[in-house]
Amino acid sequence: MSEFKRISPEQALALRAEGAVVVDIRDPQAYAAGHITGATHLDNHSVADFIRNADLDAPTLVVCYHGNSSQSAAAYLVGQGFSNVYSIDGGFELWRSTYPGETAQGNAE
């Protein structure tokens, strides 16, 4: 894949069940208030370590608030060598309304 793909929450749920990595690029307070279960919080301070330690071929799902900022972040990850990147349409807001039981709370790390 030379570009990221936009996917629905339903497609993201299926990929997550198969072991896809989920990264949440929202601010730390929003992440702490609620995020996709198993998601890693990713920001300007943690992205370098994330990239260095990541499997660049693993499916990687990027989520933001509404599915807009995640597209830029997904494109950035593709530019860093990731080959299987997806932006979740509707962001965490749509995910939470679709799958309220698939969310967690708490700070990163």
From Swiss-Prot:
Family label: Belongs to the GlpE family.
Name this polypeptide is given: Thiosulfate sulfurtransferase GlpE
Catalytic reactions on record: thiosulfate + hydrogen cyanide = thiocyanate + sulfite + 2 H(+); thiosulfate + [thioredoxin]-dithiol = [thioredoxin]-disulfide + hydrogen sulfide + sulfite + 2 H(+)
UniProt cross-references to NCBIfam families, sorted A to Z: PRK00162.1
Gene Ontology biological process terms from the UniProt entry: glycerol metabolic process
Subcellular location: Cytoplasm
Enzyme Commission number: 2.8.1.1
Function: Transferase that catalyzes the transfer of sulfur from thiosulfate to thiophilic acceptors such as cyanide or dithiols. May function in a CysM-independent thiosulfate assimilation pathway by catalyzing the conversion of thiosulfate to sulfite, which can then be used for L-cysteine biosynthesis.
List of catalytic residues: 64 (cysteine persulfide intermediate)
HAMAP family xrefs: Thiosulf_sulfurtr
Database matches in InterPro entries: GlpE_sulfurtransferase, Rhodanese-like_dom, Rhodanese-like_dom_sf, Thiosulf_sulfurTrfase
Listed PANTHER family: FAD-DEPENDENT OXIDOREDUCTASE, THIOSULFATE SULFURTRANSFERASE GLPE
GO molecular function, one term: thiosulfate-cyanide sulfurtransferase activity
The Rhodanese domain, residue ranges: 16-104
Family annotation (Pfam families): Rhodanese
Chief location of this protein within or outside the cell: cytoplasm
Domain of life: Bacteria
Keywords recorded for this protein, A-Z: Cytoplasm, Transferase
